[in-house]
């Protein structure tokens, strides 16, 4: 928890003042029963109206000052809690940005979203309540007991018996429910994960008429969550009736002892009223304390989940700077794989095995294979989204591990299978490639990506709004814009991971021709299911079940690689790929 507590350093003053003002408010509250006892014992008994008015004025003054202290405490506690959660959320988001794909895959997107949102909100609520009540409630409980001794020692012993019994109930419930809240939160993660998966793949679900099975899956997970929450709720609900039973029995005992003391002249009727008021104050504060414990238990469970993310160290280390001279040999290797293997964390079988090839600068490399053959796994090693578990990967003549993150990602641009655009404008999305790019550079990239025509057709051109995820654009438009975004950065290696799947054959061919015509020595990796898209590549890597079963040009592979021949034949058998 040390990492999380450091985010409270900027709010130490507020974190100290909030409980202090609450204690000050509680001090004024403790004097109220004594003033009321005086009104009954002196004012009412003597029919002294002036005395009653003066004491009522004192009660009003205590209420006003107490209210001022309470509002001040609320302000400081809210400022500390909101500021703390804001700082923690920023730190968590920044930490997540440093995590590698392996850590992201292990934890899951839905879990990270939950910890960024509801978990931190729960921590904020718990901290806010804690700062206001963690001193006030115990202070009132102990203070009321001490004040009871100033009224009548014999009656005050009832407080001494009641308070420990109440504490056992309150803390017993806390000990039982705290681990259960963690389990409930884990089940909530499961429900959120299923919801996200269903909404993301809603078209597939409906295409296969799987609505009923998805509903059943969701209901099963939701039922487990509901049962756990009900179980926790049932245990927590015992707190109020048990505490009320103890308090009411204590009040009955108090009235009984009070009646005896009044008969023998040991105390007045106003003193009994004061003692009952003190007992009621204890009841109110213990109910608050019980609620505080429940909220803090939830907050601690959520804080532990947030801390687990913060404790997760990135699996990849990037050097701060590139050591030695940058290689400028234009005839050298752009990418070299030497007996590379890759096994994902938690996977039983390797995704890639013994992959070796060399891509020269300026070459176009095709990657093809069946579903699950390891195409995306292979190209993910080039920008170092994952580290090879066997062998070495060299980029531009150096091991990938020697590059700083910015230098490597600046040299290697990746266009993913799923085109991802961000809310803003076409211009703001393109500037992700190079924030200092001029309009001429943006249009040049759009021309190469075959996107210039439809962007010009937009009323605002480059400043045309883009909705979150590019919802207002077609699949082909999104793919072309993501390719243009990659080209704006003028990388030395461009990876197109099946990123032209939504393009027609004519546009796909025009794109490949435009890429080949780019000046310089751009090395292009094209991952595609279409053999036609790779026919003119300098080399084609053929993968099957994580192994490289073919390497060469199109014509050679048709003669030497049965897997490639089968893929090609399946697409051209009916001639639909060329018509």
Language model regions located:
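ABC-type nucleotide-binding domain
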Residues: 326-579
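Helix-loop-helix
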Residues: 47-54, 147-161, 231-305, 309-310
């Amino acid at each position: 928890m040390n990492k999380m507590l450091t985010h409270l350093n900027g709010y130490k003053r507020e974190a100290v003042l909030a409980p202090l003002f609450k204690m000050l408010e509680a001090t004024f509250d403790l004097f109220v029963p004594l003033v009321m006892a005086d009104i009954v014992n002196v004012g009412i008994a003597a029919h002294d109206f002036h005395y009653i008015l003066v004491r009522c004025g004192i009660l009003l003054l205590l209420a006003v000052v107490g209210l001022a202290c309470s509002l001040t405490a609320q302000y400081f506690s809210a400022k500390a809690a909101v500021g703390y959660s804001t700082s923690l959320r920023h730190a968590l988001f920044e930490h997540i940005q440093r995590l590698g794909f392996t850590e992201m895959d292990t934890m899951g997107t839905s879990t990270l979203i939950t910890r960024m949102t509801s978990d931190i909100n729960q921590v904020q609520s718990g901290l806010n309540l804690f700062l206001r009540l963690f001193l006030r409630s115990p202070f009132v409980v102990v203070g009321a007991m001490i004040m009871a001794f100033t009224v009548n020692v014999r009656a005050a012993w009832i407080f001494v018996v009641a308070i420990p019994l109440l504490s056992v109930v309150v803390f017993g419930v806390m000990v039982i429910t705290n681990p259960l809240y963690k389990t409930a939160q884990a089940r909530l993660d499961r429900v959120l994960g299923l919801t996200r998966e269903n909404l993301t793949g809603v078209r597939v679900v409906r295409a296969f008429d799987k609505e009923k099975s998805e509903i059943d899956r969701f209901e099963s997970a939701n039922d487990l969550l509901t049962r756990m929450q009900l179980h926790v709720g049932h245990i927590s609900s015992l707190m109020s009736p048990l505490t009320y039973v103890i308090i009411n029995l204590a009040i009955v005992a108090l009235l009984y002892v009070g009646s005896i003391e009044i008969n023998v002249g040991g105390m007045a009727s106003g003193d009994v009223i004061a003692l009952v008021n003190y007992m009621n104050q204890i009841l109110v504060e213990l109910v608050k304390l019980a609620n505080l414990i429940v909220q803090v238990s939830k907050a601690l469970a959520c804080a532990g989940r947030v801390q687990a993310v913060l404790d997760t160290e990135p699996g990849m280390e990037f050097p701060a700077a590139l050591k030695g001279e940058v290689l400028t040999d234009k005839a050298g290797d752009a990418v070299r794989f030497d007996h590379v293997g890759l096994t994902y964390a938690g996977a039983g079988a390797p995704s890639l095995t013994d992959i070796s090839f060399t891509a020269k600068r300026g070459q176009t490399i095709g990657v093809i294979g069946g579903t699950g053959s390891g195409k995306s796994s292979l190209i993910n090693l080039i920008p170092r989204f994952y580290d090879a578990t066997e062998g070495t990967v060299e980029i531009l003549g150096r091991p990938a591990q020697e590059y700083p993150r910015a230098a490597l990602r600046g040299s290697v641009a990746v266009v993913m299978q799923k085109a991802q655009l961000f809310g803003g404008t076409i211009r703001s999305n393109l500037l992700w490639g190079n924030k200092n790019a001029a309009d001429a550079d943006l249009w040049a990239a759009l021309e190469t990506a075959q996107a210039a025509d439809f962007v010009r057709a937009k009323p605002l051109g480059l400043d045309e709004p883009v909705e979150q995820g590019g919802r207002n654009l077609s699949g082909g438009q999104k793919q072309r814009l993501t390719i243009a975004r990659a080209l704006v950065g003028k990388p030395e290696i461009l990876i197109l991971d099946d990123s032209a799947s939504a393009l027609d054959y004519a546009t796909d061919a025009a794109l490949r021709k435009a890429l080949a015509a780019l000046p310089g020595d751009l090395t292009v990796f094209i991952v595609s299911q279409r053999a036609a898209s790779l026919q003119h590549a300098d080399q084609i890597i053929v993968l099957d079940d994580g192994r490289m079963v073919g390497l060469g040009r199109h014509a050679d592979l048709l003669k030497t690689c049965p897997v490639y021949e089968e893929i090609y034949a399946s697409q051209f058998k009916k001639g639909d790929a060329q018509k």
